[in-house]
Design a protein with these regions (language model features):
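Glycine-rich beta-strand-to-loop/alpha-helix junction loops that act as flexible
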Residues: 173-176, 194-197
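Short glycine-rich anion-binding loops that position phosphate/pyrophosphate groups of nucleotides
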Residues: 138-140
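Acidic, divalent-metal-coordinating active-site segment for phosphoryl/phosphodiester hydrolysis
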Residues: 176-188
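Conserved N-terminal beta1-alpha1 strand-loop-helix module at the mouth
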Residues: 1-87, 91-95, 102-110, 122-130, ...
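Generic enzyme active-site microenvironment
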Residues: 32, 172-173
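Catalytic cores of soluble, metal-dependent hydrolases
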Residues: 184, 193, 200-202
Length: 214
């Protein structure tokens, strides 16, 4: 499986509807929306009102990544805003199983995010509850960072865990993804790639998405 989820954090916020319509017409599979609270990560980005606006124009599923403290408090809010897929950080959840059950109870796909230096083995007892796992390949909070090379190893480790305990679980990678490392990530076992600057800073974003899926 080779899915592309362009990150709207790298879109032109002054022309967001235009960029969403471009993605609707492209071969991308999901739209990735980064929600940041200024506490769990230093930056602040989208909230529920912006997600709701994006949903009005998007024709692809919304892949909403919560980079916030205590994400379980906001599951219903983001369901109401239009999230189809909701991922929460392992590092931000005291009771991760409760949060995942809440996401599923609200009719969304649910997943766990691991920061670059959080070990894959920590998912051993929760992977069965995950529809996907998102591996951060940069430190979260800002777009345009350099890809962390150890990510390939983590993808392979996670793939082994998924095959052993939850073969239906998708592996998503977010951060520094480009045309050079995309095929290597798919080869390592990734199913979904989040691409920001590589798509939106290219001369032809739709063509870049097509190339990434090859």
């Amino acid at each position: 499986m080779k899915l592309i989820s362009p990150s709207l954090l790298s879109a032109d916020f002054g022309n967001l509807q235009r960029d969403i319509e471009m993605l609707n017409a492209s071969e991308c599979d999901w739209l990735h929306v980064d929600v940041m609270d200024g506490l769990f990560v230093p930056n602040i980005s989208f909230g529920q009102p912006i997600v709701k606006h994006i949903k009005r124009h998007a024709k692809k599923p919304l892949d909403v990544h919560l980079m916030i403290m205590d994400p379980g408090r906001y599951v219903e809010d983001f369901k109401n805003a239009g999230a189809d897929i909701l991922t929460v950080h392992y590092e931000a959840c005291t009771h991760l199983d409760r949060v995942l059950h809440s996401i599923h109870d609200h009719g969304m796909k649910g997943g766990v995010v691991l920061n670059p230096h959080t070990a894959v083995c920590l998912l051993e007892d929760i992977i069965q509850e995950c529809d996907l796992v998102l591996l951060m390949s940069v430190n979260p909070g800002f777009g345009g960072q350099k890809f962390i090379e150890n990510t390939y190893c983590k993808v392979r480790q996670l793939k082994e865990l998924c095959l052993r305990k939850n073969p239906e679980c998708l592996i998503e990678v977010d951060g520094g993804v480009n045309l050079q490392n995309a095929p290597l990530l798919f080869e390592a076992g990734a199913d979904v790639l989040v691409a920001g600057n590589a798509v939106f800073k290219s001369d032809d974003p739709a063509a870049t998405i097509h190339q990434m899926k090859q």
